């Protein structure tokens, strides 16, 4: 096994925490390791694998350097740049899903740091918040909405219409925060930066492979799509494959197994059976709170076994993506790409107040809806 991979695992405190939690939970449920692979959402793992390969391919091609240089010519202040990146992340997430949007915007943000002095960690935090806010608008913005849309019987427009008030409220809140958190001071460019060298052939190949991979996802042939993408990089640029942060996949696998073990706890089985009898406020708080612990996608899957795919449930699990790091898998993706331990704590300074505000105002808006 690659020594760099082992060193990365040894440094990964979050992965180690997940392993410890899993070991502790195993003491209170039947020990059945053979069932653990079935607890993993392999569609998510395969999709992430393909996206990480494609994004790393574009990054190593040098195209983000070219795009970043063009962007810095258009924006003159931190506030302008932050507003653009936040709006771009939110807009992309409405139709490309929140994780895909992050795989585009975050590497670009990291590249911009080479060209000018920017608060890169703060920008990445706001981009993570932006994709959570933007993706909740449409049925295809995130995995939980895809599940809810399939169960609701609503059209694309009807589902988007029921989510629009919450999406507008969250985006206005986020843009207002941008106004206060990013000053209007001029961007300070680094001197002596050379003109970027990039590889057009690799960029166009990544674009072609991206189309192939998306088509495979649409046809529910994600494994074959991943095989084609990996084969393409073996031929074009093998360094892409070894440069990907594969430990992220182990983190996701550990999360899925921990969630599975948690739901098997005998003490929780009776609690879940009472979910259908909860009041509107009780279900609201349960969906948000559960999302903080096991993430909003598993929470949606779990709660749909007991309650219908209502507007209340859709709003609650999407709001649950804010707050603590596990609330949304998009949070984990964004912060991992930042590759800076300090960002893990700073994220919560913004995300927890957003959760409290969204839970309070969101429930108030829900009461005003017919």
Report each predicted region and the residues it spans:
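N-terminal membrane topogenic signal
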Residues: 1-19, 77-78, 197-205
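Long, contiguous bundles of hydrophobic transmembrane helices that form the permeation core
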Residues: 2-4, 172-231
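Interfacial loop-to-helix junctions that mark the boundaries of transmembrane helices
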Residues: 6-14, 34-44, 154-166, 195-199, ...
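Transmembrane helical segments that form the transport core of multi-pass membrane transport proteins
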Residues: 39, 56, 61, 68-70, ...
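Membrane-interfacial loop-to-helix junctions in multi-pass transporters
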Residues: 42-44, 73-84, 115-123, 200-204, ...
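Short helix-coil transition sites and intra-membrane helix breaks within transmembrane domains
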Residues: 56-62, 92-104, 134-142, 262-264, ...
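Hydrophobic transmembrane alpha-helices that form the pore/transport pathway of multi-pass ion
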Residues: 85-87, 91-136, 301-315, 343-344
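C-terminal transmembrane helix pair
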Residues: 160-171, 175, 285-370
């Amino acid at each position: 096994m690659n020594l760099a991979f082992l060193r990365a695992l040894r440094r990964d405190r979050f992965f180690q925490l997940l392993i410890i939690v899993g070991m502790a939970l195993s003491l209170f449920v039947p020990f059945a390791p053979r069932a653990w692979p079935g607890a993993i959402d392999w569609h998510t793992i395969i999709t992430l694998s393909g996206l990480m390969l494609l994004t790393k391919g574009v990054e190593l091609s040098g195209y983000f350097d070219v795009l970043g240089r063009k962007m810095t010519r258009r924006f003159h202040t931190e506030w302008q740049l932050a507003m653009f990146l936040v709006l771009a992340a939110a807009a992309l997430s409405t139709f490309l899903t929140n994780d895909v949007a992050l795989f585009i915007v975050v590497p670009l943000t990291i590249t911009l740091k080479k060209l000018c002095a920017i608060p890169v960690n703060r920008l990445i935090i706001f981009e993570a918040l932006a994709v959570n806010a933007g993706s909740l608008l449409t049925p295809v913005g995130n995995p939980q909405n895809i599940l809810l849309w399939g169960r609701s019987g609503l059209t694309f427009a009807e589902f988007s219409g029921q989510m629009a008030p919450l999406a507008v409220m969250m985006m206005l809140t986020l843009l207002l925060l941008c106004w206060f958190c990013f000053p209007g001071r001029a961007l300070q460019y680094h001197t002596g930066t050379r003109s970027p060298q990039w590889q057009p052939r690799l960029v166009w190949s990544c674009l072609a492979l991206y189309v192939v991979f998306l088509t495979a996802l649409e046809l529910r042939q994600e494994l074959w799509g991943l095989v084609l993408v990996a084969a393409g990089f073996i031929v074009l640029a093998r360094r892409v494959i070894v440069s990907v942060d594969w430990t992220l996949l182990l983190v996701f696998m550990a999360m899925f197994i921990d969630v599975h073990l948690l739901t098997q706890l005998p003490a929780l089985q009776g609690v879940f059976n009472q979910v259908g009898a909860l009041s509107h406020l009780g279900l609201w708080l349960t969906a948000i709170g559960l999302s903080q612990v096991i993430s909003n996608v598993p929470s949606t899957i779990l709660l749909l076994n007991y309650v219908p795919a209502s507007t209340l449930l859709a709003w609650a699990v999407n709001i649950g993506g804010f707050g603590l790091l596990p609330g949304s898998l998009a949070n984990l993706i964004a912060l991992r790409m930042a590759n800076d331990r300090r960002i893990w704590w700073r994220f919560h300074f913004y995300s927890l107040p957003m959760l409290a505000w969204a839970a309070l105002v969101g429930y108030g808006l829900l009461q005003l809806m017919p």
